[in-house]
């Protein structure tokens, strides 16, 4: 009986590793802060893929990078990952002018992505975690999980954005369709979002401060950064 049980365990483990591997991305690719999500493949309805979103650590002298990319794999084969390309860069104003004379894009940190339904259609929102002054609360929208994502909360000046998000934002759609946002550095914040903007507080609600104790506060937790509802 013990031998039979051991054989079952071995076969189970072998079956798992037959469909997965580590490292799962090429050694030249660097995506820390990864958030994996399972979304329906827009090109193969009824099939699902795992999409990896994260900061793109390709700057030699700074954290993260000036673009965000996504890799994906079929849920049935986690050994074959596909590069789906650059999904977002922040380098131009709303009317297409470069932010800076040297046309360098903004550095983007750990992002988050959410899927929701709008008018019967799947929509994806990206919090790219842009920390450049005036664009910290940036949010972008796409009708595909692999982008491209377009900024959807420009101010009237066309170069800054509006909203409540701060450092390391996360966004979450509950089963009842209500949307929530989370962010913070040393202290944690959260709020129910207005579904018409996806970046402002829902009317009649307030920002919740210190959702859990921060790293400089007394309490069971020591929140520092990287809000996530995962």
Give each language-model segment a name.
Residues 2-3, 230:
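Basic side chains
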Residues 20-230:
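Carbohydrate-active catalytic/glycan-binding domains of CAZyme proteins
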Residues 3-16:
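Sec-dependent N-terminal signal peptides
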């Amino acid at each position: 009986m013990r031998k039979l049980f051991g054989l079952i365990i071995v076969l189970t483990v072998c079956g798992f590793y037959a469909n997965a591997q580590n490292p799962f991305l090429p050694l030249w690719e660097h995506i820390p802060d990864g958030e994996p999500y399972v979304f329906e493949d827009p090109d193969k309805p009824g099939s699902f893929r795992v999409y990896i979103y994260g900061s793109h650590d390709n700057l030699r002298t700074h954290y993260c990078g000036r673009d965000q990319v996504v890799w994906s794999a079929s849920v049935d084969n986690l050994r074959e990952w596909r590069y789906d390309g650059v999904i977002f860069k922040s380098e131009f104003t709303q009317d297409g002018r470069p932010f800076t004379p040297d046309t360098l894009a903004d550095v983007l940190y750990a992002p988050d992505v959410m899927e929701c339904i709008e008018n019967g259609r799947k929509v994806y929102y990206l919090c790219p975690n842009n920390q450049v002054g005036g664009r910290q609360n940036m949010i972008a929208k796409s009708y595909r999980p692999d982008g491209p994502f377009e900024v959807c909360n420009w101010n009237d000046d066309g170069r800054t954005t509006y909203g409540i998000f701060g450092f390391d934002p996360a966004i979450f759609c509950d089963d009842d369709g209500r949307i929530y946002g989370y962010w913070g550095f040393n202290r944690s914040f959260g709020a129910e979002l207005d579904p018409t903007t996806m970046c402002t507080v829902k009317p009649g609600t307030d920002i919740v401060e210190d959702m859990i104790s921060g790293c400089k506060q007394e309490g069971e937790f020591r929140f520092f950064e990287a809000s996530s509802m995962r």
